[in-house]
Structure formats: structure tokens, C-alpha cells
């Protein structure tokens, strides 16, 4: 048995083709991310990976749509999304495959109307 602490991993990313990683694999990535109300991630796309975001706790705005605890959002490769935190939130994110650097900011897009 091994013990890890989520705080030891970069932005909650704990499995994937990167270090540190509990399991190094190029097949998928998993993160458990904590956000505070008001946090915002600019619109971006993944050219190679599909992403599944599960809202465990909290409420967020993605592409102008509001999502809450227990919602599962599937974002296909090439589909842009932004992410505005409406209340303190915890997510689980799965991306497949795991491709380091496969995040491309789309600065001209304001999908949730955030300026």
C-alpha cells in the first residue's frame, strides 16, 4: 500500500503522461481539482483529447451553461469551453488520451460572456 496527498500533484493532476504521477500512462489523465468562487479558466480547446468533467460539489458556468453537483459534461476534442466558478467547486476530470501540452487557449472566445 502506498499513500499520496492530492496537494503533492500539480493542479490536482494525479494520473497521466506527466510527473509527478501516481500512474504514468499516455492512455488517459485524471485530476481532482478544487476551485474557489470567482475562479475562471479562459476558453480553450484540446486538439487530441476528449474531456469528461464531473461536478462533485459546487456550481460552474461552462460555455454559458450552468452545471451543478452530479452533472457530467463531455467535451469532445476540438470543442472550445471556458470555466467560471459560481460557488466553491470540486471536480473530477478525465481526459483521453493523455497528451502533454494539448491545451490551446482561445483568447478571442468569451463563451460564458465573461470579460
What role is predicted for each listed range?
Residues 26-46, 77:
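Conserved short histidine dyad/triad with adjacent acidic residue
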Residues 63-82, 91:
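Short acidic-glycine-tyrosine-enriched beta hairpin
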Residues 31-33, 53, 92:
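Conserved hydrophobic/aromatic positions in well-ordered beta-strands
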Residues 21-24, 41-47, 63-65, 84-85:
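Short histidine-centered beta-strand/loop micro-motifs
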Amino acid at each position: 500500500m502506498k499513500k499520496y496527498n492530492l496537494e503533492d500533484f500539480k493542479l490536482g493532476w494525479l494520473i497521466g503522461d506527466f510527473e509527478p504521477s501516481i500512474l504514468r500512462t499516455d492512455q488517459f489523465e485524471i485530476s481532482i481539482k478544487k476551485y474557489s468562487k470567482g475562479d475562471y479558466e479562459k476558453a480553450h480547446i484540446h486538439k487530441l483529447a476528449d474531456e469528461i468533467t464531473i461536478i462533485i460539489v459546487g456550481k460552474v458556468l461552462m460555455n454559458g451553461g450552468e452545471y451543478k453537483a452530479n452533472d457530467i459534461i463531455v467535451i469532445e476534442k476540438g470543442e472550445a469551453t471556458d470555466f467560471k466558478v459560481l460557488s466553491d467547486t470540486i471536480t473530477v476530470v478525465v481526459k483521453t488520451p493523455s497528451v502533454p501540452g494539448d491545451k490551446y487557449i482561445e483568447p478571442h472566445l468569451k463563451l460564458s460572456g465573461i470579460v
